Amino acid sequence: MRPETPAKSHPFTRPTRRAALTGLLALAACGPIAFGGAEPRIDATAPVTVALLVPAGSTVQGNDILAANLENAARLAVSDLQGVQIDLRVYATQGDPAVAAQVARQAVNDGARIILGPVHGAEATAVGTAVAALGINVLAFSNNPAIAGNNVFVLGLTPDNAARRVLSYATQNDRGQVMIIGERTTAGELMLAAVNRAAIDAGAQIVATETYDFSQQGIVAALPQMAATARSSGAQSILFTADSAGALPVLTQLLPDNRIAYPQFQFMGVTQWNVPPATLQLRGLQDGWFTLPDPAVTQQFESRYAQAYGATPHPIAGLAYDGIAAIGALLGTGSPEALSRGSLVQGSGFVGVNGVFRFLNDGTNERGLAVATIRDNAVVILDPAPRSFIASGA
């Protein structure tokens, strides 16, 4: 994929789904916009240049496919905009922070008024630094809250979001005495910190924390202490920070074998237990709780994307659509400060293909998530995702 690829039109065989997604964009700003900040100033009645930074040209396997998926989703969103003109220009970062910073500066020289992407945290930090003095905001696809702040906002689903939602649900359902099980890695430490922050917001009580070395041998070695702590701590729930590609399958198999299981203990997690779908077959995850974006709008996007491009979208491709949805909604106000920091953090938020979301003052985000369980190897929604932050009490 070459940088600055011109937009292409795509035929759609089912206009009802297009109308549905277009409707999302028409409603993308969930309420009145409160504007602030002096830069960047734009003419919202003319085409506005948006730079999309993708990891094309990288030596990392899969990055070119991810780059193409992000571009496809962004162009799908641009084609759905009504009353707003976006000149989308695509730049390849090669997955390299130095290259990302270079192309970000080039994008601003080319007229970009906001940057969508890049994917990886180190790239996003480099890009934010490169364009900060120019008053350009960056909507990165990362889910790492540590990189957020100043002119960098993260679009990805952060562990804080998932932990806050599932712990709030646990507290409301008399399962608020929680034991955490996490791995002894840098990523594991970040997840544990997110869960502890979320517990304060959710009113949950962390009664114990157990960790393990990130290996099958490490898990087996830690298992007796995990089981003993679960029994002695008064825990009503056990929250796993691991995902299906990590220790989750092993933990949820071995703990029940040691009489640590539902219904005495409610298993729950801060990762999406329906990804990949084979995870739903795991015996230990049946009746467990996890969070996911609004499945109705997500499935609508996946179907639309498949019709347009003949393939299932990458799991994070929808973030590119969400970014364009937010930008389009703000441009639709006609304000010359539509892409300023103050505009981005307006409290009512936006509607995207992952549900409602809003940017927070610290550069992180809040997303409306559903709480789900697994029954008979299928996802069952326990508490639907909110459709607006006002309705959800925010």
Cite the ranges covered by each PLM segment.
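N-terminal secretory signal peptides
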Residues: 1-15, 19-29
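Beta-alpha junction/loop-to-helix N-cap segments that form part of ligand/metal-binding clefts
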Residues: 38, 69, 80, 84-146, ...
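Periplasmic-binding protein-like
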Residues: 107-119, 138-141, 177-182, 231-247, ...
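Extracellular/periplasmic periplasmic-binding protein-like sensory domains
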Residues: 248-321, 334, 385, 389-392
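Segments of small-molecule ligand-sensing domains
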Residues: 309-324, 328-383, 393-394
